[in-house]
Amino acid sequence: MKSSLAVLSTARSDTTTTYIGRNQMIAPMAFQAKRSTFLCPLLVALAILFSLTAVSSGTSWAKDHAGSSQATVSAVAGDNQAVTAKGEVKNSFAPIKTCFNFLKEQPFVFILLALAIGYPLGKISLWGISLGPTAGTLLVGVLISIIGQNIFGIIYGIPSIVSTIFLLMFMYALGLKVGPQFFSGLKTGGLAFIVIGLIVWSLNWLICFFGVKLAGLEAGFAPGIISGSYTITAIIGVAQTALTNGAYTPPPGVSTEQIGANIAAGYAISYVLSNIGIILLIRYLPQIFGHDPIADAQLAEKELSGGATDPVPGAAGSLSLGFSHFDLRAYEVDHQEIIGKTVQEFFHLYPEAPILRVVRQGKLLNLSENNPIKRGDIVSVRADVHELIADGKKLIGKESDSILARDVPIEVADIHIGSRDVAGDTLAELGRSIGFGLQLKALFRFGQELPLLAGTAVQVGDVLRFVGPDFCIQQAAKRLGGRPILNSSITEVMYMAIAMGIGYIFGSLSFNFAGIPFALGTSAGCLLAGIFMSYWRSRNPEFGGPMSEGARSFLQDIGLNLFVAVLAAAVGPKIIESFHGTTAIWVAIIGILGALVPPLVAFVVGIKVFKLNSVVAAGASTGARNSTPGLNAICEQSQSAVAAVPYPLTYALTTVLALVGGYFAMLLS
């Protein structure tokens, strides 16, 4: 038997080696196929956009051509031919205008089109650099809105509540992901995160304010560029407040309306450029300085978890079965030593090989009745494969291929201890009393994983993670006084709605100081709601109902990108309106510098001075820059949400500072 096992292990090893080698050989082919999958629809979409762009210049040329032709023809043959020529030019683009009008009448189609083109566009990699789906969606949405207005005079307007809802869903889903790590992250890097926030805010203000002064731009551009480069629209409102309440007096000959237009222009240009720029910068910051974002993210997760090997209750992957060295085998009972003993008696004799199923004459027996085992019964045992192969015939009988006996579903469940009857029992004692058919996978206390030692005593509030058949799990749950939380695809919407509602209300509360309104912000409020919800679930998995990881991941992904698509429809036309003379160039330069230099400097300080993990430092920097798309970019690049741990702290700090800075930037303009 041992030699057979050795042969089996060797065969598996060879197969694995061959499989890996084959993957290495076909990797370029797989890449080509994957690239083609994205390029085909993308090229078609880009061809359409290119055609529309060509139409824009063609329209301008045609109008000029028609105008000159009209003058010539009217001199020779009258005005009728000129009018006909003009009508033909207009009618030739009618079908395309109809399409753009349709997007205006059906804004939902506008959003879906931006997503459909933006996602594959963001996945295209040139020299190892890609935009990512968020920047791709933003770029496509801006292009469509610009073409629609400048060629056909169509302005797209999508209700702001749409973008607000999707942004809040994204923030809540992100909070659910990082909740258990948030508080441990604050303990280890709180001071560093505050310093990073101060660096980003102060450098942004200095670059934008003095950049406007050096460029000789008019009043109003400074707060507008700060607002756009920081992507905080509320700064515009603060600057407008300084205008309307008389705190700022416009220079002679300059109206408040003109200053308001300058604020809007500075915001529109710098907003889009800084949004795309910060996504690219944050995405590749660790790699720029020689760090592997995936490896660093894994290291950060390990450090923040305190060396725990299992995800905390409620976290992604916490209820996945994973690998187990235990296997299911079925045997036909043939030994007198076993015949006549009940399932429980067999468990006490051989706890390392519990019987999980008994088949008698083709029918399953109810294990709860604890009937004696008879000769010829087929029993299913879950234990170490090697032990079964070596000792199976000696203990039970010959192995059986009965499908009914071997078809035993195995579950993973978290059980919160609610009974004081078991409080103080050691794991060894629990194993003897309730361990039938179960494997203890992990033990958590206050969200922290504890080592599985035989002498460890359990307490009320502890969470035990078991692997085993549903019948065994239910029996253990009754004894422990808890409800087993199993892996589920169902999401409890009630708790999500309540949590998001509380977070929204908390974030919308504001107070005035010296005429400046201060508020945490509804998006940050929903983020904190998600953080606290997952934090409490890590201590009691019964709290908050089930939240499918698939549903959470979908909310995070689609929420942000739908928000960006709606935003693109609004800001696109304003960009073209602001491009005149050298003003637009200066605004673009100052805005990009104000958006990218501060987080770059803060990142360097974080990894060099405070010795922060590169992914955590990137998360702190993007939080200090108030860039949710930037956070999503580093999460995608590192394949982890650990970058979001410092995000709420730096986000909240710099939101307040940026509002104050925007107000004083207007006063000093």
UniProtKB/Swiss-Prot annotation:
Its membrane topology: Multi-pass membrane protein
Q: Which InterPro entries match?
A: AAE_transporter, RCK_C, RCK_C_sf, YidE_YbjL
Q: Which UniProt keywords apply?
A: Cell membrane, Membrane, Repeat, Transmembrane, Transmembrane helix, Transport
Single Gene Ontology MF annotation:
monoatomic cation transmembrane transporter activity
| Pfam families, sorted | Asp-Al_Ex (PF06826)
- Superkingdom is Bacteria
Q: Does the keyword Disulfide bond apply?
A: no
Domain RCK C-terminal intervals: 316-397, 398-483
Q: Which PROSITE patterns match?
A: RCK_C
Identify the GO cellular component terms for this protein: plasma membrane
Q: Where are the transmembrane segments?
A: 39-61, 124-146, 153-175, 190-212, 221-243, 263-285, 484-506, 516-538, 558-580, 585-607, 645-667
Q: Where in the cell is it found?
A: Cell membrane
Q: Biological process GO annotation list?
A: potassium ion transport
Q: Tell me the protein family, please.
A: Belongs to the AAE transporter (TC 2.A.81) family.
Query: What's the protein called, per UniProt?
Result: Uncharacterized transporter DP0386
Source organism lineage?
Bacteria, Pseudomonadati, Thermodesulfobacteriota, Desulfobulbia, Desulfobulbales
